[in-house]
Amino acid sequence: MKKLLSCIIIGMVVLGGLGAVVTATNRNQKNSQRNDTTSSPYVDELDQSMTDYDGSLPLGRTNIFGFYANLSIAQSFIPQKELLTRTQFLMARNASTSYPCVLAVRDNLTGENLAIISVGPNEFPVVNGTPTEDQLAWINFNFNDIWVIPGQTYYLVVYTANITENYYWIAGNGTNIYPNGTVMLSIDDGKTWSEFTNADGCFKTYGLHETFLEIAIKPGLFKTTFVIKNIGNYTAWDVTWNFTVSGGFILLGRNFIGNISELTPGGEIIASTGFILGLGKVTLSLKVSAANVKELSIQKDAIVLLFFVKII
Protein backbone atom coordinates (compact mmCIF):
# COMPACT_ATOMS: atom_id res chain seq x y z
CA MET A 1 0.00 0.00 0.00
CA LYS A 2 2.86 2.39 0.84
CA LYS A 3 4.33 1.88 -2.62
CA LEU A 4 1.00 2.61 -4.29
CA LEU A 5 0.20 5.66 -2.17
CA SER A 6 3.67 7.19 -2.45
CA CYS A 7 3.60 6.68 -6.20
CA ILE A 8 0.22 8.38 -6.52
CA ILE A 9 0.95 11.24 -4.10
CA ILE A 10 3.98 12.20 -6.17
CA GLY A 11 1.87 11.89 -9.28
CA MET A 12 -0.87 14.11 -7.86
CA VAL A 13 1.67 16.88 -7.35
CA VAL A 14 2.82 16.45 -10.93
CA LEU A 15 -0.76 16.41 -12.17
CA GLY A 16 -1.49 19.61 -10.32
CA GLY A 17 1.20 21.45 -12.27
CA LEU A 18 1.17 19.73 -15.64
CA GLY A 19 -1.45 19.22 -18.30
CA ALA A 20 0.07 16.53 -20.53
CA VAL A 21 -2.65 14.85 -22.56
CA VAL A 22 -2.27 11.16 -23.37
CA THR A 23 -3.84 11.44 -26.62
CA ALA A 24 -28.01 -31.21 -35.40
CA THR A 25 -27.77 -31.17 -34.88
CA ASN A 26 -26.60 -30.01 -31.53
CA ARG A 27 -27.79 -31.95 -28.47
CA ASN A 28 -25.76 -30.22 -25.77
CA GLN A 29 -27.99 -27.25 -25.04
CA LYS A 30 -27.83 -25.68 -21.60
CA ASN A 31 -28.25 -22.46 -19.69
CA SER A 32 -25.65 -21.14 -17.29
CA GLN A 33 -24.66 -18.12 -15.22
CA ARG A 34 -22.19 -15.50 -16.40
CA ASN A 35 -21.91 -13.91 -12.97
CA ASP A 36 -23.68 -13.81 -9.64
CA THR A 37 -26.44 -11.42 -10.67
CA THR A 38 -26.96 -11.65 -14.43
CA SER A 39 -28.37 -14.72 -16.16
CA SER A 40 -26.87 -15.51 -19.54
CA PRO A 41 -27.02 -18.41 -22.00
CA TYR A 42 -23.24 -18.63 -22.02
CA VAL A 43 -20.24 -18.61 -19.71
CA ASP A 44 -17.63 -16.00 -20.52
CA GLU A 45 -13.96 -16.58 -19.73
CA LEU A 46 -11.30 -14.65 -17.86
CA ASP A 47 -9.01 -12.82 -20.29
CA GLN A 48 -6.78 -10.17 -18.63
CA SER A 49 -6.29 -9.58 -14.90
CA MET A 50 -4.19 -8.19 -12.08
CA THR A 51 -5.35 -9.34 -8.65
CA ASP A 52 -2.33 -8.75 -6.38
CA TYR A 53 -3.57 -6.18 -3.84
CA ASP A 54 -1.17 -3.53 -2.51
CA GLY A 55 -3.42 -0.65 -1.47
CA SER A 56 -6.42 1.52 -2.35
CA LEU A 57 -7.01 4.99 -3.76
CA PRO A 58 -10.07 7.24 -3.56
CA LEU A 59 -12.02 7.57 -6.80
CA GLY A 60 -14.00 10.80 -6.85
CA ARG A 61 -13.79 14.14 -5.06
CA THR A 62 -12.10 14.10 -1.64
CA ASN A 63 -9.22 15.73 0.23
CA ILE A 64 -7.40 12.49 0.97
CA PHE A 65 -4.13 13.99 -0.30
CA GLY A 66 -4.43 17.19 1.71
CA PHE A 67 -6.31 19.08 -0.98
CA TYR A 68 -9.58 18.49 -2.80
CA ALA A 69 -9.28 16.70 -6.12
CA ASN A 70 -11.66 14.69 -8.27
CA LEU A 71 -9.66 11.59 -9.13
CA SER A 72 -10.54 9.50 -12.20
CA ILE A 73 -8.61 6.33 -12.97
CA ALA A 74 -7.97 4.44 -16.22
CA GLN A 75 -6.36 1.02 -16.65
CA SER A 76 -4.97 0.06 -20.03
CA PHE A 77 -5.01 -3.58 -21.14
CA ILE A 78 -4.47 -5.73 -24.23
CA PRO A 79 -7.21 -8.32 -24.82
CA GLN A 80 -6.52 -11.75 -26.25
CA LYS A 81 -10.15 -12.62 -27.01
CA GLU A 82 -12.20 -10.98 -29.75
CA LEU A 83 -15.32 -10.35 -27.65
CA LEU A 84 -15.20 -8.28 -24.46
CA THR A 85 -18.18 -9.07 -22.23
CA ARG A 86 -17.56 -7.38 -18.87
CA THR A 87 -14.93 -6.27 -16.39
CA GLN A 88 -14.45 -6.21 -12.62
CA PHE A 89 -12.56 -3.93 -10.24
CA LEU A 90 -11.76 -4.52 -6.56
CA MET A 91 -13.62 -1.66 -4.88
CA ALA A 92 -15.63 -0.22 -1.99
CA ARG A 93 -17.31 3.12 -1.27
CA ASN A 94 -17.39 5.82 1.34
CA ALA A 95 -20.50 6.13 3.51
CA SER A 96 -21.29 9.54 1.98
CA THR A 97 -21.20 8.31 -1.63
CA SER A 98 -24.50 8.97 -3.41
CA TYR A 99 -23.73 8.98 -7.15
CA PRO A 100 -23.05 5.93 -9.38
CA CYS A 101 -19.64 4.68 -10.36
CA VAL A 102 -19.20 4.79 -14.13
CA LEU A 103 -16.99 2.57 -16.28
CA ALA A 104 -16.28 3.28 -19.96
CA VAL A 105 -14.30 1.18 -22.43
CA ARG A 106 -12.28 3.13 -25.00
CA ASP A 107 -9.65 2.49 -27.64
CA ASN A 108 -8.42 6.07 -27.18
CA LEU A 109 -8.12 7.43 -23.66
CA THR A 110 -9.82 10.72 -24.55
CA GLY A 111 -11.93 9.32 -27.40
CA GLU A 112 -15.45 7.99 -27.74
CA ASN A 113 -16.86 5.29 -25.49
CA LEU A 114 -17.10 1.82 -27.02
CA ALA A 115 -19.19 0.75 -24.03
CA ILE A 116 -20.34 2.45 -20.85
CA ILE A 117 -22.22 1.39 -17.73
CA SER A 118 -23.10 2.84 -14.32
CA VAL A 119 -23.21 0.84 -11.09
CA GLY A 120 -25.11 2.30 -8.14
CA PRO A 121 -23.58 2.85 -4.68
CA ASN A 122 -25.75 0.09 -3.18
CA GLU A 123 -23.68 -2.51 -5.08
CA PHE A 124 -20.50 -1.59 -3.17
CA PRO A 125 -19.43 -2.45 0.39
CA VAL A 126 -19.32 0.60 2.68
CA VAL A 127 -16.11 1.47 4.54
CA ASN A 128 -15.06 4.23 6.91
CA GLY A 129 -11.56 5.38 6.11
CA THR A 130 -9.01 3.58 3.96
CA PRO A 131 -10.22 -0.01 3.46
CA THR A 132 -8.34 -3.22 4.05
CA GLU A 133 -8.34 -5.90 1.36
CA ASP A 134 -11.02 -7.87 3.23
CA GLN A 135 -13.37 -4.87 3.12
CA LEU A 136 -13.26 -4.66 -0.68
CA ALA A 137 -15.34 -6.62 -3.21
CA TRP A 138 -15.05 -7.48 -6.88
CA ILE A 139 -17.61 -5.24 -8.57
CA ASN A 140 -19.12 -6.32 -11.90
CA PHE A 141 -19.36 -3.78 -14.71
CA ASN A 142 -21.54 -5.79 -17.09
CA PHE A 143 -21.84 -3.64 -20.23
CA ASN A 144 -23.17 -4.74 -23.61
CA ASP A 145 -20.70 -7.10 -25.30
CA ILE A 146 -18.33 -5.41 -27.75
CA TRP A 147 -15.93 -6.64 -30.41
CA VAL A 148 -12.28 -5.79 -29.82
CA ILE A 149 -9.02 -6.50 -31.66
CA PRO A 150 -6.65 -8.87 -29.82
CA GLY A 151 -3.22 -7.30 -29.40
CA GLN A 152 -4.54 -3.73 -29.45
CA THR A 153 -4.52 -1.47 -26.38
CA TYR A 154 -7.83 -0.50 -24.77
CA TYR A 155 -8.69 1.53 -21.67
CA LEU A 156 -11.05 0.93 -18.75
CA VAL A 157 -11.95 4.42 -17.54
CA VAL A 158 -13.55 4.60 -14.08
CA TYR A 159 -15.04 7.78 -12.62
CA THR A 160 -17.93 9.28 -10.68
CA ALA A 161 -19.70 12.63 -10.29
CA ASN A 162 -17.51 15.55 -9.21
CA ILE A 163 -19.35 16.14 -5.93
CA THR A 164 -17.57 16.76 -2.62
CA GLU A 165 -17.22 13.60 -0.50
CA ASN A 166 -18.76 11.48 -3.27
CA TYR A 167 -16.03 8.91 -3.71
CA TYR A 168 -15.26 5.23 -4.03
CA TRP A 169 -12.18 3.19 -3.18
CA ILE A 170 -10.36 1.30 -5.92
CA ALA A 171 -7.55 -1.19 -5.29
CA GLY A 172 -4.23 -1.46 -7.07
CA ASN A 173 -0.56 -2.31 -6.85
CA GLY A 174 2.48 -0.06 -7.15
CA THR A 175 4.95 -2.60 -8.53
CA ASN A 176 3.81 -2.96 -12.18
CA ILE A 177 2.72 -6.60 -11.97
CA TYR A 178 0.50 -6.53 -15.08
CA PRO A 179 2.79 -6.50 -18.16
CA ASN A 180 0.22 -5.45 -20.79
CA GLY A 181 -0.93 -2.13 -19.41
CA THR A 182 -0.67 0.52 -16.75
CA VAL A 183 -2.63 3.06 -14.70
CA MET A 184 -3.49 6.61 -15.78
CA LEU A 185 -4.84 9.29 -13.43
CA SER A 186 -6.82 12.48 -14.04
CA ILE A 187 -7.87 15.25 -11.66
CA ASP A 188 -9.78 17.34 -14.23
CA ASP A 189 -12.69 15.05 -15.14
CA GLY A 190 -10.72 13.14 -17.76
CA LYS A 191 -9.56 16.10 -19.85
CA THR A 192 -5.88 15.34 -19.21
CA TRP A 193 -4.17 12.21 -17.95
CA SER A 194 -0.83 11.24 -16.46
CA GLU A 195 0.55 7.72 -16.82
CA PHE A 196 2.08 5.71 -13.97
CA THR A 197 4.12 2.94 -15.56
CA ASN A 198 4.92 1.32 -12.19
CA ALA A 199 1.31 0.85 -11.06
CA ASP A 200 -1.77 -1.17 -12.01
CA GLY A 201 -5.34 -1.44 -10.81
CA CYS A 202 -6.80 -4.66 -9.42
CA PHE A 203 -9.01 -5.64 -12.34
CA LYS A 204 -10.32 -8.54 -14.44
CA THR A 205 -11.66 -8.61 -17.98
CA TYR A 206 -13.84 -11.36 -19.41
CA GLY A 207 -14.63 -12.34 -22.96
CA LEU A 208 -15.06 -15.01 -25.60
CA HIS A 209 -13.10 -16.15 -28.63
CA GLU A 210 -14.75 -15.49 -31.96
CA THR A 211 -15.96 -18.50 -33.90
CA PHE A 212 -17.46 -18.95 -37.38
CA LEU A 213 -20.66 -20.41 -38.79
CA GLU A 214 -21.70 -21.66 -42.22
CA ILE A 215 -25.32 -21.50 -43.37
CA ALA A 216 -27.34 -23.03 -46.22
CA ILE A 217 -31.01 -23.01 -47.32
CA LYS A 218 -32.71 -26.16 -48.67
CA PRO A 219 -36.25 -25.56 -50.01
CA GLY A 220 -38.68 -28.44 -50.32
CA LEU A 221 -42.26 -29.61 -50.10
CA PHE A 222 -44.47 -27.98 -47.41
CA LYS A 223 -41.48 -26.41 -45.64
CA THR A 224 -37.95 -25.12 -46.10
CA THR A 225 -35.04 -26.44 -44.09
CA PHE A 226 -31.75 -24.74 -43.39
CA VAL A 227 -28.46 -25.83 -41.93
CA ILE A 228 -26.27 -23.86 -39.53
CA LYS A 229 -22.84 -25.41 -38.96
CA ASN A 230 -20.05 -24.33 -36.62
CA ILE A 231 -16.89 -24.37 -38.74
CA GLY A 232 -14.78 -22.54 -36.16
CA ASN A 233 -12.64 -23.72 -33.26
CA TYR A 234 -14.83 -22.50 -30.39
CA THR A 235 -18.38 -23.04 -29.18
CA ALA A 236 -20.90 -20.57 -30.60
CA TRP A 237 -23.05 -19.23 -27.77
CA ASP A 238 -26.67 -18.07 -27.93
CA VAL A 239 -27.22 -18.87 -31.63
CA THR A 240 -30.25 -17.08 -33.09
CA TRP A 241 -31.75 -17.32 -36.57
CA ASN A 242 -34.37 -15.29 -38.41
CA PHE A 243 -35.86 -16.69 -41.64
CA THR A 244 -38.11 -14.47 -43.78
CA VAL A 245 -40.03 -14.84 -47.05
CA SER A 246 -40.51 -11.56 -48.92
CA GLY A 247 -42.42 -10.85 -52.13
CA GLY A 248 -45.06 -12.99 -53.80
CA PHE A 249 -48.47 -13.75 -52.35
CA ILE A 250 -47.81 -15.61 -49.10
CA LEU A 251 -50.74 -16.75 -46.97
CA LEU A 252 -48.73 -18.62 -44.34
CA GLY A 253 -45.10 -18.72 -43.29
CA ARG A 254 -43.52 -15.32 -43.86
CA ASN A 255 -41.27 -15.35 -40.80
CA PHE A 256 -39.68 -17.96 -38.55
CA ILE A 257 -37.23 -17.39 -35.70
CA GLY A 258 -35.34 -19.75 -33.43
CA ASN A 259 -32.56 -20.01 -30.87
CA ILE A 260 -30.31 -22.53 -29.13
CA SER A 261 -27.95 -21.83 -26.28
CA GLU A 262 -24.81 -23.34 -27.82
CA LEU A 263 -23.36 -24.98 -30.91
CA THR A 264 -20.07 -26.81 -30.42
CA PRO A 265 -17.26 -26.89 -33.03
CA GLY A 266 -18.23 -29.19 -35.89
CA GLY A 267 -21.84 -29.31 -34.69
CA GLU A 268 -24.75 -28.31 -36.88
CA ILE A 269 -28.40 -27.35 -36.54
CA ILE A 270 -30.91 -28.64 -39.07
CA ALA A 271 -34.04 -26.54 -38.64
CA SER A 272 -37.24 -26.12 -40.62
CA THR A 273 -39.43 -23.12 -41.25
CA GLY A 274 -42.79 -24.74 -40.78
CA PHE A 275 -45.59 -24.65 -43.35
CA ILE A 276 -45.25 -22.11 -46.22
CA LEU A 277 -48.30 -21.50 -48.43
CA GLY A 278 -48.52 -19.03 -51.29
CA LEU A 279 -47.81 -18.15 -54.93
CA GLY A 280 -45.23 -16.18 -56.84
CA LYS A 281 -41.60 -15.20 -56.95
CA VAL A 282 -40.09 -14.60 -53.51
CA THR A 283 -36.80 -13.98 -51.77
CA LEU A 284 -35.78 -16.34 -48.99
CA SER A 285 -33.57 -14.64 -46.39
CA LEU A 286 -31.77 -16.21 -43.46
CA LYS A 287 -29.89 -14.18 -40.85
CA VAL A 288 -27.88 -15.91 -38.14
CA SER A 289 -26.02 -14.42 -35.19
CA ALA A 290 -24.47 -15.57 -31.93
CA ALA A 291 -22.85 -13.96 -28.92
CA ASN A 292 -19.38 -14.61 -30.34
CA VAL A 293 -20.23 -14.71 -34.05
CA LYS A 294 -20.65 -11.67 -36.26
CA GLU A 295 -23.99 -11.67 -38.03
CA LEU A 296 -24.10 -13.50 -41.36
CA SER A 297 -26.89 -13.80 -43.91
CA ILE A 298 -27.87 -15.57 -47.11
CA GLN A 299 -30.56 -14.83 -49.70
CA LYS A 300 -32.06 -17.03 -52.40
CA ASP A 301 -34.61 -16.20 -55.11
CA ALA A 302 -37.35 -18.81 -55.26
CA ILE A 303 -40.79 -19.65 -56.61
CA VAL A 304 -43.63 -20.61 -54.28
CA LEU A 305 -46.30 -22.82 -55.87
CA LEU A 306 -48.90 -23.33 -53.17
CA PHE A 307 -46.93 -25.43 -50.66
CA PHE A 308 -43.86 -26.16 -52.83
CA VAL A 309 -40.77 -23.90 -52.69
CA LYS A 310 -38.18 -24.07 -55.49
CA ILE A 311 -34.98 -22.03 -55.76
CA ILE A 312 -34.50 -20.34 -59.15
List the predicted regions and their residue ranges:
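Secretory targeting signatures
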Residues: M1-L46, T87, L156, F203, ...
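Beta-sheet-rich sandwich/jelly-roll-like modules and their strand-loop junctions
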Residues: N31-E112, I146-T153, Y159-E210
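Short beta-strand and strand-turn-strand segments in soluble, beta-rich domains
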Residues: N113-E123, G247-G258
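Short proline/glycine- and polar residue-rich coil/turn motifs
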Residues: N122-Q135, I260-E268
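Enriched for extracellular/lumenal, surface-exposed ectodomains of secreted and cell-surface proteins
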Residues: T160-N162, S186, T244, S261, ...
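Asparagine-centered strand-capping/turn motif at beta-strand->loop junctions
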Residues: I228-G232
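Intrinsically disordered, low-complexity Pro/Gly/Ser/Thr-rich segments with frequent PxxP/GP/PP motifs
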Residues: I250-G280
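Terminal connector regions
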Residues: F275-I312
